[in-house]
Amino acid sequence: MKNILLAVDDTKGSKEAVSSFARACKCINPDRLILLHVEKLEGRSLIDGMLGDPEMATLKETLEGTDYKEALDRRAKRILDYYSKAMSENDVQGVETMVRVGHPADEIMQAAAEEGVDMIIIGSRGKRTSHLFMGSVSREVADRSEIPVLLVKSSGST
């Protein structure tokens, strides 16, 4: 595994995925680790069926420069700085950060393809019934991916 994409946000599952990766990193020893944070447009799931890709692209462009987008960017920077520091403290080399905007599973899959990664690592909340109603980003990534996906379940999840 030379190129790994580690999808991160500010959830417990993400923190545990990063912690697990940091412990295993000496064995894996990747050349490149991409920390990816996806800025999710709130309400995206409600408008999924109503907007196609061109309309979503227009919405993303419209948000550029707004207070809302700036708040999303500050949050993304804080999250990526936190995980970059954790990787540095564990002597992980080759760390890159990336921010994308949109539906998390779509953006993770697209980034993985564009960057030619060998594996995706993502935290999982581990809730047994939540995916029945709202779907699960980690489950969707695992189902759609043609490369290995490591799901790290949060301890203490039900």
Locate predicted features.
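Short, structured coil segments at secondary-structure junctions
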Residues: 137, 145-146
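Glycine-rich, Arg-bearing micro-motifs that act as flexible, cationic patches
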Residues: 119-140, 158
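General small-molecule cofactor/ligand-binding pocket signal
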Residues: 34-36, 96-100, 150
